[in-house]
Amino acid sequence: MDTFNNTTKVVKDDLTKKIQSDSKVSIAAACFSIYAYQALKDELENCDEFRFIFTSPTFVAEKTPKERREFYIPRLNREKSLYGTEFEVRLRNELKQKAVAKECADWMRRKASFRTNTTREGMNNFLVVENPEDAYTYMPMNSFTAVDLGCERGNNISNMVTRLENPASKEFLNLFDSVWNNPDKIQDVTNDVIDMISTVYQENSPEFIYFITLYNIFSEFLDDI
């Protein structure tokens, strides 16, 4: 067993060592952020399989409409967690968001599967890395974001995560598998997740982003023209 305070000792650094080319990554968490993918891009691109369960109903109560959205302006804070949470604002301000979203969507089509809890029943939040010879469980993994990986600062006083090994880790993997394979409690939402992330790079052309950026920089001077 090991512990991570996510300040001087962070979960992300340990995951880069544990996730291998033949690893299977299984996560049960409240939300997924493209910036968590970015933090572990090399490892997730090379892993064998990635499974994610939204622990509360997501993409099932009602479809998110695909109406046109404005490019991100920090003070509006309108993006969903897939595009980054409120504590990943520094990352979202960078014009890399579009590129990250495209890379993430491409990876999802090749490696990832997403399912959601469709019930009102609660579920533990955790991440399991399964390798041929061992397995590691990180808990709690409340959300799969840059904050929960220790890459960014959130609004919690503490952000402690514990890593368990076998045989305890095997129990968490069995729990995940039992939920994953239960059609009465779980629904596949992989295409919904990919479609929503894809809108980031489909809706805003490079030229549009460029001119919106210029507008945000110089708008206060327009009245003087």
Residue map of PLM features:
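PLD/PLD-like phosphodiesterase catalytic module centered on the HKD motif
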Residues: 1-225
